[in-house]
């Protein structure tokens, strides 16, 4: 029998993935990974579960019950140190530099598809490694008739997770299986219910990857002390004080503390200036400064050929893909122009590129422009 190891989180998606693989005749083993320790990592303020049983341990109990139901062996591994160093400290450093990072993408790059794969390959030696992500892998032929894995969108467009996987290198996709890629979330739930899986009705995990739901300002204040500064309009009019520019993101509407200046149009963050610790706001969700037509993308990870310069881009999860024109600056940097202006393109976020349903690669949004002028987003 062909051996496959599944990353089993305790949630319904990975449970159904393991069930389907066993049904298909694979020799299935599972691994549960724990990557966060609230006490060790000073996760105090903003943590609603601090005085409860550790959520990760509850997830482990669910994973254990699922493995017993399915008759598969469950292993456990901790990547708490690796997550702290490779994911969380990069996350905090980005905020310190006035950027808005995506920890889920960092987590996939450094933990799920690097540390986890290295551990499983070394310790368990399977033919394949499977995950419960909503994505697909197809193989294309390039030079020397070799087959290369390409990341493709899931059938369920609402749950598609290729954006979060977009910065994976080609080698990280080798021998990976995504059993849920051709199923909808509703179908996954139905499979779990029909087969009496213990977590069939368990809620999906939300919040920061492997950390969970948090009061974001309070959570960040555990690691980044508040730095009070001015909130101004673009013409320099002072309105109020903010808690620290790193706590806000471009396009943000809520929690600005501008109720005394309310009118028919709500306020939005349109700029952040780190050197002066100034937060810029304007009224109306169609304010011109919220929009851009060009961006510089760095730290590119690309899979396959670079010949197509007319692609689609996604600059935040579940955003509709936008037509873009690419200009390569060097191997790791490109400039994109989008004929239709896009709202709240934010430095530090990931820009993922698509050729129809194939996710070609991604990079970090570095700078944002409109009609040749750089936006004051950093």
UniProtKB/Swiss-Prot annotation:
Coiled-coil spans in chain: none
Catalytic reaction(s) noted: S-sulfanyl-L-cysteinyl-[protein] + uridine(34) in tRNA + AH2 + ATP = 2-thiouridine(34) in tRNA + L-cysteinyl-[protein] + A + AMP + diphosphate + H(+)
Record-linked Pfam families: tRNA_Me_trans (PF03054), tRNA_Me_trans_C (PF20258), tRNA_Me_trans_M (PF20259)
GO cellular component: cytoplasm
Main location as per UniProt: cytoplasm
Region (Interaction with tRNA) location: 159-161, 316-317
Entry GO MF terms: ATP binding; tRNA binding; tRNA-uridine 2-sulfurtransferase activity
UniProt: ATP binding residues: 7-14, 33, 132
GO biological process terms on file: tRNA wobble position uridine thiolation
Active site: 107, 209
Matches recorded under InterPro entries: MnmA-like, MnmA-like_C, MnmA-like_central, MnmA-like_central_sf, Rossmann-like_a/b/a_fold
Keywords (A to Z) from UniProt: ATP-binding, Cytoplasm, Disulfide bond, Nucleotide-binding, RNA-binding, Transferase, tRNA processing, tRNA-binding
The protein's Enzyme Commission number: 2.8.1.13
Covalent S-S links between cysteines: 107-209
Spans annotated as Interaction with target base in tRNA: 102-104
Subcellular localization, as worded in the UniProt entry: Cytoplasm
Record site: Interaction with tRNA: 133, 349
Main enzyme class: transferase
Family stated for the protein in its record: Belongs to the MnmA/TRMU family.
Biological role: Catalyzes the 2-thiolation of uridine at the wobble position (U34) of tRNA, leading to the formation of s(2)U34.
Alphabetized NCBIfam families for the sequence: PRK00143.1, trmU
Name of the featured protein: tRNA-specific 2-thiouridylase MnmA
Naturally occurring in which organism (per UniProt): Aster yellows witches'-broom phytoplasma (strain AYWB)
